[in-house]
Regions:
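Short, Lys/Arg-enriched N-terminal segments with co-localized hydrophobic residues
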Residues: 1-10
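Glycine-aromatic micro-motifs
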Residues: 12-156
């Protein structure tokens, strides 16, 4: 897990006010404007890489274990209120469940059976998030192409 050093003094001051959780976003929540609407008290810290996972689409973004691969995303500090709002947005615990790596929380889909491409508007939201975080869209485009290939194979 690659995390650049964080400003521990700022986090310590914030923790005195409210307990926070480190949250890794890899889909639509990377979009800073959308994240602020869902979680006004969230703080974007930096881009982050989650090793041994890959981005896939099941209509919406998901990640799955994939040794040797990586997922780039956004690291946020979120409050308990933010986490509850994200739980509702992500359909926790029915659509997504929470997982943790090195005390960083992220959501993964419960149903891992089908790969299916995202809608155009949803994809634009994610692309904006990639731009917000200064992350190359190469892996995003690869994941979309994989989902389109899977769809083509299911039609044939």
């Amino acid at each position: 897990l690659t995390i650049i050093r964080r400003n521990t003094k700022r986090m310590a001051n914030r923790k005195q006010k409210e307990e926070v959780t480190l949250y890794f976003a890899y889909g639509s929540n990377m979009n800073h404007e959308h994240m602020k609407m869902r979680c006004p008290k969230s703080t974007y810290l930096r881009k982050m890489t989650l090793p041994d996972y890959e981005l896939v689409f099941r209509s919406v973004a998901d990640i799955q274990k994939a040794p040797g691969k990586k997922v780039e995303g956004a690291l946020f500090e979120i409050t308990k209120d933010c986490e509850r709002a994200l739980d509702r947005y992500e359909g926790f615990p029915h659509l997504y469940i929470k997982q943790y790596v090195d005390n960083v929380m992220f959501y993964t889909m419960v149903d891992k059976d089908n790969v299916y491409p995202p809608g155009e508007g949803y994809l634009r939201t994610i692309m904006t998030g990639y731009n917000n975080c200064d992350i190359s869209t190469e892996s995003l485009i690869d994941a979309v192409n994989e989902s389109l290939t899977a769809l083509d194979k299911s039609i044939i």
